[in-house]
Amino acid sequence: MPPKQQLSKAQKAAAAMAGGKKSKKKWSKKSHKDKAQHAVILDQDKLDRILKEVPTYRYVSVSVLVDRLKIGGSMARVALRHLETEGIIKPISKHSKQAIYTRATASE
């Protein structure tokens, strides 16, 4: 193996300046989700919409009502209890954290 070629100080300085350091990673800013402006008071328009649309849903839960109808979670829970007592929807699974319903069929 041939010996390494000796570089002068000027050549070493030029080589050091040419390479440069790797730049630091730029952390991207997280996109912030806007605060939801859901309804918290049940007016007649919302009630009519709930009574009209919810019986057509195959899967009904609090989160489904919040997403589709733009209502608050507490209002969605009240609406689900009302629809269950009316016989419009029937429970599939109920426990303290999540209640899942489906539409009630006419044969039942």
From Swiss-Prot:
Organism: Eremothecium gossypii (strain ATCC 10895 / CBS 109.51 / FGSC 9923 / NRRL Y-1056)
Residue ranges with Low complexity bias: 1-20
A cellular-component GO term for this protein: cytosolic small ribosomal subunit
Keywords from the UniProt entry: Ribonucleoprotein, Ribosomal protein
Domain of life: Eukaryota
InterPro entries assigned to the protein according to its UniProt record, in alphabetical order: Ribosomal_eS25, WH_DNA-bd_sf
GO molecular function, one term: structural constituent of ribosome
Similarity annotation: Belongs to the eukaryotic ribosomal protein eS25 family.
Coiled-coil stretches: none
Compositionally biased intervals (Basic residues): 21-35
Name of the molecule in the record: Small ribosomal subunit protein eS25
One Pfam family named in its UniProt record: Ribosomal_S25
Region feature (Disordered): 1-36
